[in-house]
């Protein structure tokens, strides 16, 4: 191997203290010897040889790209945006050349080592082709109608094609949920389910213009609501089933386990987290959603391409157990934080003056929540005479890492380490991009280049990666054993912003995990899979947390608050801004003790009293009160809704109340008017059905009771 910048390396080496655990490997027992192997052959992983990514970049980029595109089109988009979204998805999922659906299948088959049966594969691919062809026809008709909205024939065509296509999705979805093959087909199911829900949304957006009746629009809307629950629970259940099947005991099993966790999050769970935001009655204007989950790229360690040297691969080199690795690199549920500084401590692995490796041996991370205090964590060895390297990342997004996995060989004992990392970053608020690097020196070793963008590619390829990156570095873990030091990077999605900015012209969703503190009694727990990240829990009364928010003017803008929560008990939610009480209200239990935390356990509710912010930066506080110890209350997120958005809901409530009152001869509701018929009562019932559960759930229940009473009176009168 050629050494790079030999003089620089020697200057590092001359000041370095040799770590005995690395320079005397033969003192340690090992069962992995390279029998009859040639030392040079073992190290023949040419300088900067790139590790073959487990899957093509385009496969994961499809999942990332579709989720990213949808994140920019939540709420009720313009007609042109809807057509553009379909055009994008058609190009991603039904491109020319090899079927993207086949690539999805092959990827998961490889991950879980399970082949899809020939019949199930062929049936799914045939149905997918039919759906793609039908979607393309509908998309073409939709574009024609957008350009000719007053053309009766064009309107009739798109309406009929819509109804036929929606029914086709209902018929074909079961082909992607074949018994015994749910896990390998899961990305197919998730993408098809996503398209079905987007299609159902079109009835709410365009149905009235197409000539659909209010009853027909409500039917499509109700189907969208029920299918959102079904699809969310299905995807979460089979994701967890597949992940648990891969749980093993050794380091090699952890590699596949982590790959499945990461890739299925990108291809399945990220989409599922967006499903509720397709509800146009809840989100009738542009809406900002955020994904706060973390994903982990592959460990930075050499993987030898020659099976004869398998013992030099990091996970075969007396690496820690599955559970030890998981505990070392996967963080416990925590508030969302941002990396500000990394201090790296190096160790020296030396065989000779021409074969040595200064490598990452430990680190100290500094990070903070939004508006919170600085926190630190330390891993690995920090007691070294090699000068530590400190890299600042305050207000910078590290969007890409290029890491060298190094292999140094002492006779029969390999040593795996990381001798170089380039961190590519950009300032959050400025169009300036650069990089910081860790590079203490090495010579005569085998190296492989691992590029994070092979696993977490940008959302698009049409822009520079420092503009279109999809993830930012959030944390670094270290797998540590006597002869292995392997890094694992943790990443958060770019949509989880650093500022909690509330806009006056859109609905702002803020996951509560973005609070800056965690009061006594509150805890962060793993999300159920469909929330896009972790959630907060309390089992006794008190504050959940404080969120530092930034307000875009005008400050006179008023908002109403919504909460997405689950609870085993009736309770009160209290909210305040900068310590001043804003809202307080009673809310119902959503689940029973011992029940699963599934989709139906969560409910989004709202306060009716509006409020405004007086400062550009404020602290918003939410707490849960008036319930018995031992119950469970969870909050996923809060939502700030500009007041104008809820006027329609208020109008609908008043209209329903007036229609009910008009059926009776007096305000005491004892006698129906003579002209009230069954059909009239059914129409009023549909009006009540369309009321917002989020704002007027109790009023809706009360009005339904009156409608039932009216039906009973009408039956008695007819008799």
UniProtKB/Swiss-Prot annotation:
Pfam families assigned: Endotoxin_C (PF03944), Endotoxin_M (PF00555), Endotoxin_N (PF03945)
GO MF annotation: an example: toxin activity
CDD domains (UniProt xref): delta_endotoxin_C
Keywords: Sporulation, Toxin, Virulence
UniProt cross-references to Gene3D superfamilies, sorted A to Z: Galactose-binding domain-like, Pesticidal crystal protein, central domain, Pesticidal crystal protein, N-terminal domain
Top-level taxon of origin: Bacteria
SUPFAM superfamilies per UniProt: delta-Endotoxin (insectocide), middle domain, delta-Endotoxin (insectocide), N-terminal domain, Galactose-binding domain-like
Gene Ontology annotations of biological process type: sporulation resulting in formation of a cellular spore; symbiont-mediated killing of host cell
Miscellaneous: Toxic segment of the protein is located in the N-terminus.
Protein family (similarity comment): Belongs to the delta endotoxin family.
Its job: Promotes colloidosmotic lysis by binding to the midgut epithelial cells of many lepidopteran larvae. Active on Plutella xylostella and on Bombyx mori.
Xref: PANTHER family: ENDOTOXIN_N DOMAIN-CONTAINING PROTEIN-RELATED, PESTICIDAL CRYSTAL PROTEIN N-TERMINAL DOMAIN-CONTAINING PROTEIN
Protein name per its UniProtKB record: Pesticidal crystal protein Cry1Id
Organism this protein belongs to: Bacillus thuringiensis
Gene: cry1Id
């Amino acid at each position: 191997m050629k050494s790079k910048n030999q003089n620089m390396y020697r200057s590092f080496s001359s000041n370095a203290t040799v770590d005995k655990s690395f320079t005397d490997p033969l003192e340690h027992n090992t069962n992995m010897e390279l029998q009859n192997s040639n030392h040079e052959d073992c190290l023949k992983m040419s300088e900067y040889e790139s590790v073959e990514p487990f899957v093509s970049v385009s496969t994961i980029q499809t999942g990332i790209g579709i989720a990213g595109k949808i994140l920019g089109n939540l709420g009720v988009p313009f007609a042109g945006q809807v057509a553009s979204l379909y055009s994008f998805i058609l190009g991603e999922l039904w491109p020319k050349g090899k079927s993207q659906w086949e690539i999805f299948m092959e990827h998961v088959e490889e991950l879980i080592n399970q082949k899809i049966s020939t019949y199930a594969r062929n049936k799914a691919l045939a149905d997918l082709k039919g759906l793609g062809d039908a979607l393309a026809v509908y998309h073409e008709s939709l574009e024609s109608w957008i350009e000719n909205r007053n053309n009766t024939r064009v309107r009739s065509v798109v309406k009929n094609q819509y109804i036929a296509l929606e029914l086709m999705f209902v018929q074909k979805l079961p082909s992607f949920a074949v018994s015994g093959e749910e896990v390998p087909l899961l990305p197919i199911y998730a993408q098809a389910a996503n398209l079905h829900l987007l299609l159902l949304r079109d009835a709410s957006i365009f149905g009235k213009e197409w000539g659909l009746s209010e009853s027909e629009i409500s039917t499509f809307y109700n189907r969208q609501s029920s299918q959102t629950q079904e699809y969310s629970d299905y995807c979460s259940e089979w994701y967890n089933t597949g992940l648990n099947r891969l749980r093993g005991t050794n380091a090699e099993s952890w590699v596949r386990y982590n790959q499945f966790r990461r890739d299925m999050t990108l291809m399945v769970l990220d989409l599922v987290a967006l499903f509720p935001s397709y509800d146009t009655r809840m989100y009738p204007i542009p809406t900002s959603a955020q994904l706060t989950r973390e994903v982990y790229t592959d460990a930075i360690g050499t993987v030898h391409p020659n099976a004869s040297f398998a013992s030099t691969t990091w996970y075969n080199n007396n690496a820690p157990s599955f559970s030890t690795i998981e505990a070392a690199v996967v963080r416990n549920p925590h508030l969302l934080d941002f990396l500000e500084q990394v201090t790296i401590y190096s160790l020296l692995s030396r065989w000779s003056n021409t074969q040595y490796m200064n490598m990452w041996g430990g680190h100290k991370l500094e990070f903070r929540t939004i508006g919170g205090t600085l926190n630190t964590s330390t891993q690995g060895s920090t007691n070294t005479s090699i000068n530590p390297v400190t890299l600042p990342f305050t207000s910078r997004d590290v969007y890409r890492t290029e890491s060298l996995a190094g292999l140094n060989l002492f006779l029969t004992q390999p040593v795996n380490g990381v001798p170089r990392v380039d961190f590519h970053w950009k300032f959050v608020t400025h169009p300036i991009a650069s990089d910081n690097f860790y590079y203490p020196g090495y010579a005569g070793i085998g190296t492989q280049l691992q590029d994070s963008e092979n696993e977490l590619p940008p959302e698009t390829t049409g822009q520079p990666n420092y503009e279109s990156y999809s993830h930012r570095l959030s944390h670094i873990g270290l797998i540590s054993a006597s002869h292995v030091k392997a890094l694992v990077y943790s990443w958060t999605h770019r949509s989880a912003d650093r500022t909690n900015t509330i806009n006056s012209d859109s609905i702002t969703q803020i996951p509560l995990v973005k609070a800056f503190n965690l009061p006594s009694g509150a805890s962060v727990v793993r999300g159920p899979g469909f929330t896009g990240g972790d959630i907060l829990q309390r089992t006794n009364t008190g504050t959940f947390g404080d969120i530092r928010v930034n307000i875009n003017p005008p400050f006179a803008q008023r908002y109403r608050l919504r909460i997405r929560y689950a609870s085993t008990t009736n309770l009160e939610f209290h909210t305040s801004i900068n310590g001043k009480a804003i809202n307080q209200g009673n809310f119902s239990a959503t689940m029973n003790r011992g029940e699963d935390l599934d989709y139906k356990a969560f409910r989004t509710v709202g306060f009716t009293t509006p409020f405004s912010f007086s400062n550009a930066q404020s602290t918003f506080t939410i707490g849960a009160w008036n319930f018995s110890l031992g119950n469970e209350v969870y909050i996923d997120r809060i939502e700030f809704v500009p007041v104008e958005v809820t006027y329609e809901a208020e109008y609908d409530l008043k209209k329903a109340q007036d229609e009910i009152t008009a059926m009776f001869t007096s305000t005491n509701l004892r006698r129906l008017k003579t002209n009230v018929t069954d059909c009239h009562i059914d129409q009023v019932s549909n009006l009540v059905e369309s009321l917002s559960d989020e704002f007027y759930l109790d009023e809706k229940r009360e009005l339904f009771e009156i409608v039932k009473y009216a039906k009973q009176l009408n039956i008695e009168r007819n008799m």
